[in-house]
Amino acid sequence: MNASDNGDGPRLVLARHGRTAANVAHILDSRPPGYPLDELGEAQALQLAARLAGWPLRAVYASRAVRTQQTAAPVAAAHGLPVTVLDGVQEVDIGDLEGRSDAAALALFDEVYRAWWLGDLGARTSGGESALDLRARFLPAVEEIVGGVTDGDVLLVSHGAAVRLAAAALLGETAETFYVPNTGLVVLRRDPQGWALESWDTAEPVRGDVTAGGTPA
């Protein structure tokens, strides 16, 4: 998907942030400000900026997490745009599992995560959010940033689980979506009938990446 696309209506470009030390160590990290990008994550952000250099970006948004803002920064700079921090699009909160990396914690989150894709959107970890909670805050934020846009692209840098859950909701699906790698993109186009999927970056999940079936990132 690139700047030569001639479709009608604005596009929402959902991006997952670059890699962090928490991704590498399989630490459950859902709450802002969270971990910053590591060295590879910074390189991935620059690669994303190069990839999107010719895209007709109208605005660049990021969640309240440091890693999403760092990922968005080089993209925004290349287009002469600011990075606007947007409430409501942070990762799904994992409650009492925050900061843990032990096998028991990862298994507990994976159980809840899989329940969502089986249709139990109200499932949650102790003290955490459900998929319904995520949708209730994420979807109004999308409407806020895209509602007045008639053409071009709006970039929103968010998180692995959040992107998957939000995209599924926008597309009217509850079935499992694809894994999104670090700085992977999900491109949706809005038309009078709603949202349509244009492209979805995916790859073989990195070993231990919980957003493949589990961990927030």
Language-model features: locations:
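Acidic, low-complexity terminal tails and accessory targeting/binding regions
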Residues: 1-11, 92-104, 147-152, 168-217
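Phosphate-coordination/substrate-recognition cap region in phosphate-metabolizing enzymes
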Residues: 2-3, 7-9, 47-113
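Short, hydrophobic/glycine-enriched beta-strand segments
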Residues: 11-17
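Loop-to-helix element that buttresses phosphate recognition and phosphoryl-transfer chemistry
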Residues: 19-75, 124-139
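Phosphate-handling substructures
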Residues: 22, 36, 79-137, 196-201, ...
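Active-site signature of alpha/beta-hydrolase-fold catalytic machinery across serine-
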Residues: 74, 165-169
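Short basic (Lys/Arg) and small-residue
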Residues: 159
